[in-house]
Amino acid sequence: MEKENPTKGNISLADSGVVFDQSQHRYFLGGKELSGVTSTLIKRAFPSTYDNIPQAVLDAAAQRGSVVHASIEMFNGIFDGDDSMFPADDWTPELRSYVGMVKTNGLRCLASEYIVTDFKDYASAIDGVYADSDGGIVLVDYKTTSQLYYESVALQLSIYARFFEMVNRGLKVKSIACMWLRGDKGRYVELGRVSDGVLDDLIRADLNEDLSYSYTPEIPGGFYALEQEFVELSRKIGGLQERQTAVKDKILALMRQNNAKSYKTAAGSFTYVPPTTGKKFDSAKLKEDAPDIYDKYTKESTIAASLRIKLKK
């Protein structure tokens, strides 16, 4: 099952020693059977995710997901991630989306279906282990469901990241991400890692079969969807603002060239404003040099709550 490519770069991944019985989907280490993460820990944290979905629909979705996973594994394994070598007839919308995400995010595949474990109770296979352009380790899970359950996949990948670092003592996971692949739609979502304390509580509850345990995501439900919408809007707005500035510069140059002060059109008026100098009041300097005067002419006002957002470049 495990497909590792140690020839890409100088990152070498360790063998966990876990044996996977693919026909029965069971994991073994030294004769002891280990539990899969999704069927135990994720199920305990999110027990009712698929309760209202008919089994036939779940089976069809699982089959579709297996096909997508297999095509990605073949692309990275047999064809070494070279899209020029991949057979034209085997391309799918999902695979094209996948390749686009890999290129956009500067990723290279180190291993597919890479098995990690805590060497005691659990084992699972990570869909893809990647290195980014800086050599940082990125763990990726592929999802093909109609709805992306951000909180669930964030927990799943956080557990994988912990086990990955246990198997590979000298390596640290830089980030975890989900590739959502659904027809010609695709989305690359970088997720936050769940803290070790929360993972400890979940594992303890599962091992003790604690029926009173209830998982509470550190990042509440619905946040990631809003985050992604905000990021996409910000990128679109940023691109439009750049285009708008470029067009304004061209209009300004055209008006200069024609010595025009103003154009009035059906859309509005365009007025050339010549360069000038201005003055700005330095309130910080006044506060430093004459604090009594500054206090005399300032007044307090109520400022409404706001949100400060700093996106990664």
Describe the residue ranges of each PLM region.
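Metal-dependent nuclease catalytic regions and adjoining charged, substrate-binding loops involved
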Residues: 151, 162-253, 259
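Short, flexible loop/turn elements at secondary-structure junctions
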Residues: 114-116, 130-132, 144-146, 180, ...
